[in-house]
């Protein structure tokens, strides 16, 4: 199944709006191996690419909302099209490694660090404070 997209609730609001809880990949723990879900790739204070990786999803190169200031469209993050393609390829390369695998485990290490492990023993760790990821 291919979907338009299914971002976390906070991705649809201004990045400075108050968040509810810690976003975790519960949906993808169940459906990752049978559902293709593109993710927003905005990079402002926080890098949304990290959530595409954590969820084992694919990326949008450019995602335009129908109107300004709605549906996650709160101005440009300043990335060039070349940077967007480079970032999309990072997500695509990871997706190629885990696309047919179940997500078998998710861990919250602390408020900013999470891990997801797939059935081929590939683990992705994201750090939303440092805006980094590691493939373990």
What residue ranges belong to the model's regions?
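Active-site-proximal substrate-binding groove within the catalytic cores of carbohydrate-active enzymes
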Residues: 1-136
């Amino acid at each position: 199944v291919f979907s338009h997209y299914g971002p976390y609730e906070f991705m649809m609001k201004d990045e400075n709006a108050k968040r509810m809880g810690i976003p975790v990949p519960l949906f993808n723990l169940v459906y990752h191996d049978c559902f293709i879900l593109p993710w927003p790739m905005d990079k402002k204070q926080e890098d949304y690419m990290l959530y595409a990786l954590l969820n084992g999803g694919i990326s949008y190169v450019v995602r335009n909302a129908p109107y300004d200031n709605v549906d996650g469209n709160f101005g440009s993050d300043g990335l060039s099209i070349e940077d967007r393609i480079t970032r999309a390829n990072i997500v695509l390369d990871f997706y190629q490694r885990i696309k047919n695998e179940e997500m078998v485990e998710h861990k919250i290490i602390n408020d900013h660090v999470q891990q997801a492990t797939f059935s081929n023993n590939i683990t992705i760790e994201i750090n939303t404070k440092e805006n980094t990821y590691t493939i373990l």
